[in-house]
């Protein structure tokens, strides 16, 4: 590595970073309520409509949005048109919070308009018994309304019903709210005048839904291919280690496997909170749910770490048998890897920006990076995501697959192309329309990483992939946190 190449690569890296900052994927100003606001609104709602004070109960919360509806609108090409509607009715920019106490819990959905859009009481039936004011459907709607543009201001009563459950009468009110291309069927259940359930069923008013379903099936199919690829890679790695006369060092593979396990534990707290909010059952204690979350995280880390360990062991052995220097000159590899990651970010951002301006590509922030910078996402989660994806994918698709395909074909170009194609199609390209542009970009990026692997070694592509993911994931988060700190006392604005 001479001084000229050092300077040239450094300049390209700086230019790449500047291009990314200037042309990075679009974001939308957040109107999400603070966690404390969502908690207070939920406490007051439960006190008013259920008659129970949950202020001192254990509290858990996560950011929530309706990914399924947003994804369908994106593929129909009408997401931008309905973006404000999604916000108004709480299908984006919402909180899901849960209060837990003595095997009882309440789940509440709160949108940015300070309205309750979801509620479920997971408590004994006798808790909801006793005298309580029974209100009419219209009166209930007026009491739940908190904004002239929100869900309840758009809701129109369509019917009522009554049934008996456990010898108690349950009243049901049905409403329909329409806005833009979205129709919401709202159901409210009351026991003894107390609200026990509020739920919505979303419907998109279109005759193109069959096309969207086919597109989603394509995404799911390619997503499954990633898991199958990992399983086949591990089987192939075991066969190489058992039947081929290869020698390798175990230390680096152990380090990679242990790093995966450690990274998995970085987000343990967030994973447990997500599990409690979305899947807690009053028949189980919070400690039990937490323990199950810990065991699940550890098991996932062990399984993923084992796959990485076996595949890296086989890939390193095969590459060493070919005389490839995959781990030599680590400082040089790290330098070129950092530069390559920044260069790829800049080129990608510039290219996507030009394609969007020419209307050849449509990127939806709600799907591509929306949840990255909103409340609840932490740097630890970004670090975990970046490390795990870079190690797991590079071990399988570069360190193992390129030597294997080269051994089978005898052609290094074929090995780079095939491994890059398989790596590209295993990605779910949610948020990009048409999808093939994103897949083509991933294929080209994969070929770039393949060339770096052959030219410099495995550490280079590992660092390049890590830097690319870390900056892409965490820069919006850092900007959001900085803007939130700088404008803490100023009113929020939106570009919806």
UniProtKB/Swiss-Prot annotation:
Pfam family name, one: Rce1-like
Where located?
Membrane
Which Gene Ontology terms of cellular component type are present?
membrane
**Keywords from the UniProt entry:** Antibiotic biosynthesis, Bacteriocin biosynthesis, Membrane, Transmembrane, Transmembrane helix
- The residue ranges crossing the membrane are 1-21, 224-244, 248-268, 291-311, 331-351, 399-419, 443-463
Return one Gene Ontology term, BP aspect.
CAAX-box protein maturation
Induction info: By Spo0A and PhoP, during nutrient starvation, especially phosphate starvation. Repressed by AbrB during normal growth when nutrients are plentiful, in association with the transcriptional repressor Abh.
Q: Is Transmembrane found in the keyword set?
A: yes
Alphabetized InterPro entries for the sequence? Rce1/LyrA-like_dom
The molecular function terms in GO held by this entry are:
endopeptidase activity
| Keyword Nucleus attributed | no
Which top-rank group of organisms is this from? Bacteria
Topology class, membrane: Multi-pass membrane protein
Q: What happens when the gene is disrupted?
A: When the skfA-skfB-skfC-skfE-skfF-skfG-skfH operon is deleted, increased rate of spore formation; a double operon deletion (sdpA-sdpC plus skfA-skfH) makes spores even faster.
General remark:
Accelerated cannibalism by skf- cells is seen on solid media but not in liquid media.
Biological role = Required for production of the bacteriocin SkfA.
Under which name does UniProt file this protein? Sporulation-killing factor biosynthesis protein SkfC
Question: Which organism is this protein's natural source?
Answer: Bacillus subtilis (strain 168)
